[in-house]
Amino acid sequence: MKRLLIFVIPLLCLLSCEDAKYSLDNRFDPENIDLRPPALFFHPPEILTTIDTSIAIELYGLELEPAAAAHLDIRYDWGSVTVDSVIPGPFFSGQNNPMEITVDEQGVLDIYLYYLPDVQNNQNEGGTWSLATVYFSTISAGESELLYGTNTILRDANNDSVRIKDFGSGYINVK
């Protein structure tokens, strides 16, 4: 009888258990954004907000090759949002913090990011990282499309272009 219980109890526990089913299809995950890597995109791709609000949008790279510098040419509707500030992301961070220069002119935001070399590296390792975070303030109702302009380029330590296959877009909808 004891042998039977030793056999039956674990069998009942085993048969009564059911594996959990998870839905791992977050549309904001880089794997689910429908871009061919290496790519640049905005995260989050869509923001619904109100007037007089501060919002943050990250400029992301998907499976980028190693780079030492970037010129990010960001286009936006300057009638509904204004740029407050730009903070470099971890993509160009090494032992030294990256250098960043920002020029904002009526709907065109030029961001220049530079990896500051150290004794071990003269460029980053590449990968999927945030290149920068842009903070916007909303000033009027409307929709602002975010685009990477034609001047967007990444360079490696030899000043060669880093290939980018695809560019994502973003939207800020101000109610």
Spell out what each predicted region is:
Residues 1-17:
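Sec-dependent bacterial lipoprotein signal peptides
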Residues 17-175:
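Acidic, low-complexity intrinsically disordered segments
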